């Protein structure tokens, strides 16, 4: 699996925003995502082909740095229902593995309108970047139909209130 580039992009963008004094909250509806997200900054859009559960799939990401953290929403369309659970699990494992996460905590994801799924989880963990710097990661993994989503915040310190606003700010328009 080649997710380190996702982490590299996120961390590079975070370093650009380290001097940003304020958060500028905005609703963002990424074209083709089917979801509206509440970002504390104006996200850039990126796309990458990844190998997930044995298939090459296009993952699209909205990413922005703010307040010493990187905020990201990623989404990928899965070709068949039987692959939704494995893709959710693989994305979660990769996100935690990319920062060598230690002792993650998890709870069921609760996004109004999502497809109920046992692999839809919120996670929080402490980890380390390749250079040894300590980071906190908080993320939510969920699906609607055949589209799988990952919302994540990665930063050098946890900002519980800001992280919560972002991670609970996803919604599916009517």
What does each of the following model-derived ranges do?
Residues 42-61, 95-143:
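Signature of long, low-cysteine stretches enriched in small and polar/charged residues
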Residues 44-84:
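Secretory pathway targeting signatures of secreted, lumenal, and periplasmic proteins
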Residues 43-45, 87-102, 145-174:
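Surface-exposed amphipathic alpha-helical segments
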Residues 25-36, 154-157:
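Short aromatic-glycine motifs in intrinsically disordered, low-complexity regions
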Residues 20-22:
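Bacterial signal peptide processing site
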Residues 15-18:
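C-terminal motif of bacterial Sec signal peptides marking the signal peptidase cleavage site
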Residues 32-49, 167:
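Proline-anchored loop/turn motifs at beta-strand termini and strand-loop-strand connectors
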């Amino acid at each position: 699996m080649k997710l380190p580039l996702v982490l590299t992009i996120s961390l590079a963008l975070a370093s650009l925003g380290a001097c940003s004094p304020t958060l500028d909250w905005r609703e963002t509806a990424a074209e083709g995502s089917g979801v509206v997200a509440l970002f504390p900054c104006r996200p850039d859009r990126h796309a990458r082909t990844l190998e997930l559960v044995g298939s090459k799939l296009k993952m699209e990401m909205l990413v922005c740095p703010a307040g010493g953290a990187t905020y990201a929403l990623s989404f990928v369309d899965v070709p068949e229902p039987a692959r939704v659970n494995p893709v959710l699990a693989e994305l979660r494992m990769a996100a935690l593995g990319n920062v060598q996460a230690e002792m993650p905590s998890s709870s069921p994801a609760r996004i109004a309108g999502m497809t109920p799924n046992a692999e839809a989880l919120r996670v929080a963990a402490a980890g380390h970047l390749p250079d040894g710097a300590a980071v906190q990661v908080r993320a939510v993994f969920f699906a609607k139909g055949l589209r799988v989503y990952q919302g994540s915040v990665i930063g050098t310190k946890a900002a519980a209130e800001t992280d919560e606003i972002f991670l609970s700010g996803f919604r599916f328009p009517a």
